[in-house]
A protein has these predicted regions:
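Extracytoplasmic gate region of multi-pass secondary transporters
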Residues: 22-23, 213-254, 258-260
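Juxtamembrane intracellular "pre-TM" segments in multi-pass secondary transporters
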Residues: 182-216
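Interfacial helix-cap and linker-helix signal at transmembrane-aqueous boundaries
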Residues: 29-30, 61-62, 146-154, 239-240, ...
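Helix-to-loop junctions at the C-terminal end of transmembrane segments
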Residues: 54-66, 263-275, 360
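Cytoplasmic helix-loop-helix junction between adjacent transmembrane helices
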Residues: 99-135
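Helix-loop-helix hairpin linking two adjacent transmembrane segments in secondary transporters
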Residues: 131-180
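Structural signature of the two symmetry-related core transmembrane helices
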Residues: 69-83, 278-292
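A late C-terminal transmembrane helix in Major Facilitator Superfamily
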Residues: 327-362
């Protein structure tokens, strides 16, 4: 489990710290930094666009770069930026730094997908990818630990420094792992297509539109973005609208993080042993049932919704990438995963815009969660189609090149 553990730590740095630590520390940073609500909104928008840009860039040109070197470079870059955040006071420089961290996070995950798809044994890939993607949940937990322990004792600046130093440690561990990493042995049914075959940039979007697996992967990510991003953005506001205790939101998000920390390994094993369709059915059904219970009685079933969210969101990325890799080379899987991240962001943007419109016109968020529940049922429907579909894997053989 060395590979998924190391890459899970990369996710802690790139996503847990790079994407979410600022939001966790912002209440403490505002005491020393004059930053307006408008500037915070700008940071949110630009980081989202940067994440999409990084994912798109990876999908278009990532196959021309060495993913091993690129993974190390993004780790060094992210760690340096995290250390810089402890010294920044200018809102413009903070915005620029967070924007670069978001783009780096997208590229980092794409590199992880390619390396695991190429170097892990076929029967372990979904487990490894799901464990790695669940590193974000561990990042959530560590952010909370920084707030509870480091900030009271050493201040918010020390939290950024701890995150940056941890990132440098992860870079060293990643380099040590990649140094001796070799491609997985060929499967018995291997055919003539090389495992590192890339989809030409001019044909990438045609492939996604015209080929079932690539299209379904992007549709899944679109719907996941449409449901999860509005859920996370509006949940606490909705609980407040219902005059429920503020602590309920905290307990719900603790449930999300705790579930995500273990869901990757369990659901990844399920995907490798019982098939990706089965694993997708389990996680999407859990998410949909949690939302159904939540809209019936938000106060009673908020934790159930949090459990379903954690069960689905964190391991989903690894399971989908593992499923795509059954049909495409490791490099093509990285390219498609990059476009999947773009569709996820587009889905989240559409979901939040629709949620804002519904709240503006009705004065309530109640109908928003009905829409999210309906969309979650579409995810279940997609899982059923995949479960019943042809699971034949395209034959591939490993390349002669190493991780670098």
């Amino acid at each position: 489990m060395r590979m998924p553990t190391t890459f899970g730590m990369n996710q802690i740095v790139s996503h847990g710290f790079g994407m979410f630590l600022f939001a966790a520390l912002m209440p403490f940073m505002r005491e020393a930094i004059e930053i307006s609500a408008w500037q915070l909104a700008t940071i949110g928008a630009l980081t989202q666009l940067a994440y999409l840009g990084g994912a798109m860039l990876l999908g278009l040109v990532g196959h021309r770069l060495g993913t091993g070197r690129l993974a190390l470079l993004t780790g060094i870059f992210s760690s340096a930026l995290l250390l810089c955040m402890s010294q920044l006071r200018d809102p413009l420089l903070i915005t620029l730094t967070l924007t670069c961290l978001a783009a780096s996070a997208a590229i980092s995950w794409g590199c992880i997908v390619e390396i695991v798809s190429r170097c892990a044994r076929a029967e372990q890939r979904s487990t490894y990818l799901s464990c790695a993607s669940s590193g974000t949940a561990w990042g959530y937990a560590l952010n909370g630990l920084l707030i509870l322990v480091v900030v009271p004792l050493l201040g918010w600046q020390a939290s950024w420094q701890v995150a940056g130093l941890f990132g440098l440690l992860v870079v060293a561990l990643t380099w040590h792992m990649l140094r001796d990493l070799k491609s997985a042995p060929a499967c018995p049914t291997a055919g003539p297509a090389p495992v590192d075959a890339a989809i030409p940039t001019s044909k990438l979007f045609a492939t996604i539109i015209g080929e079932r697996t690539a299209l379904f992967a992007c549709l899944i990510c679109l719907l996941v973005g449409f449901t999860t991003m509005p859920f996370s953005y509006w949940l606490n506001t909705y609980l407040d609208e219902l005059s429920l205790p503020a602590a309920l939101g905290g307990y719900t998000w603790a449930t999300v993080g705790g579930t995500g920390m273990v869901a990757g390994f369990i659901t990844g094993k399920l995907a490798d042993r019982r098939g990706h369709g089965t694993a997708l059915m389990v996680i999407f059904s859990g998410f949909a049932l949690g939302l159904l219970a939540f809209i019936l009685d938000p106060g009673r079933f908020a934790l159930v919704a949090g459990f379903g969210y954690g069960l689905m969101y964190f391991p989903m990325w690894g399971i989908v990438a593992g499923w795509v890799n059954q049909h495409y080379s490791s490099t093509a899987t990285m390219q498609i995963s990059g476009i999947c991240m773009v569709t996820f962001g587009l889905g989240g943007t559409l979901g939040n815009l629709l949620a804002g419109y519904i709240r503006e016109t009705t004065g309530s968020l109640h109908d928003v969660f009905f829409v999210l529940t309906a969309a979650s049922l579409l995810l279940v429907a997609l899982a059923i189609v995949i479960l019943r579909g042809n699971r034949k894997v395209l034959p591939i053989i490993p390349p002669t090149a190493g991780a670098f």
